[in-house]
Every structure is written in structure tokens, then in C-alpha cells.
Amino acid sequence: MKDLIDINNTLDLVKLKLYNEWLYTAHIYDEGNSNMHQGLTAQVVGKYIDPLNLPKDAAILDVGCGPGYFLDEMKKREYTNLTGITLSPGDIKICEEKGHKIKKYDISFFPQKDGYYDESVDFIFLRQALEHSPYPIFSLMEYNRVLKQGSKIYIEVPAPACDRKHEYNPNHYSILGQDQLMALLNRTGFKIDNFQAIEFKIGIPTVTNEDGSVKEFTEKYFCIVATKDRPLDIK
């Protein structure tokens, strides 16, 4: 009986590996440069990150770093211990050409062999990334693990049911509503300091109205600052 259980467990792990490989092989794309996201990131840093007064040598992770706009902003502010995390080869190339330190990791699992021990990180920046996780509760559990007690995380995600239908983006797996997001943060040991729903208009040059004018869409983002309130008792 024990042999049968061991075989079933092994098969489950093999399936999990295959499912992950399918997701991340089929649906990874380079974010590339975007003036809109570059500008929005600069605004986010000024509004939410600067007031935290993080030490200049704080261990900071930019999870799902894209082409490195957050890293650029923090480097301008003379932060010295910055690491970007992404699986995108194109974004890795852009970031490394700028001189940023980049790790090619899944956004949900940071290897201890590379120094990501329990309570080893001072701040996590997670802008437009959590929606790319197939299992956001696992992602948040991992962020809890590596963050020091009392440290902060910034999370920004698209809200559900927006004009641009983020749910249908090929690698958007988790478009969470406000209550679900708040509940997951609470379950994974975080205390929400600031939760804002931001609405704004966006024009996409490649999408036009019948008269040829650029069509505008209403976007809505959830912007959250949270504190690691307690470690998780996972054994």
C-alpha cells in the first residue's frame, strides 16, 4: 500500500511539473518597453514607495520586473541592493544592459540555495505581476517566507471586469476581486496598510473609433501596501 501511495505522489509531482512547463513555455512573453508603464511606475514609486523611507542598503526584490522601470527609479535614488526577478529572456537582456542584477526565477518560488532564506528580504515590489501566478496563495506564502518580520510589500494588480478584459490575456491566470485579494493577504500573514482602487482612462493607438480617433478604455488597478504581520506556521 505504501508503495502505491509513493507512486501516486510521484505521478502527482510529475503532472505538476508538466503543467508548470506548459504554462510557462506557452505563455511567457517579453513585456518590452512601454512609455505608459514607465510613467506609471515613476508615479507609484513617488506615491507609495518613497514615503516608506527604506534604508538605502535594504534588500529589495522587484518580482516580475519587466524591463526594469522600478529598478531604474530606485537606482536613481541610490538604492544599492536591488534584484529583479523574471522569466522573460527579452526583459532579462534589457535589464542586464542597464546594469541591473536579475534572477531568472518563477515569481512564486525563490531558491534557498541562492540565498533566499527565511526572513532575508526587506521589501518586495510586485507591480502587475501577481495576476500572472496560477497559484497566488502560494506566491503570497513565499513572499511571507522571505520577508523579514514587519517588512513591507507593494502589490498592484488589474481589477476584474475592466474594459480591456484582462481575464483573457494569455498569461493572466488570477484576476482577483478586492475581497478575494484582501482575504488572501490576511490568510498569508499580511496586514493591509493601504488599499486603493485607482481608475483612469487609457488610449491605445492601435485601437480606433469609427472616426479614426484613438479609442479610450477605462482601467482599474488595485494598489496595496501591506506589512508582514506574522510568519506562517508551515511544517
Give the label of every model feature segment:
Residues P205-K235:
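Core SAM-dependent methyltransferase catalytic element
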Residues F190-K201:
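Conserved S-adenosyl-L-methionine
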Residues M1-Y117, F123, L140, E219-F222, ...:
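Conserved N-terminal segment of class I S-adenosyl-L-methionine
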Residues P158-D163, I175, E199-F200:
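Short "lid" loop at the C-terminus of a central beta-strand within the Rossmann-like core
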Residues F123-P134:
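A short SAM/SAH-binding and catalytic strip from SAM-dependent methyltransferases
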Residues S151-V157:
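Conserved beta-strand signature within the Rossmann-like core of class I S-adenosyl-L-methionine
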Residues K165-Q180:
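Acceptor-substrate binding/catalytic loop of class I
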Residues I137-Q149:
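A short glycine-rich, Lys/Arg-flanked "PGG" loop and its adjoining helix->strand segment in the class I
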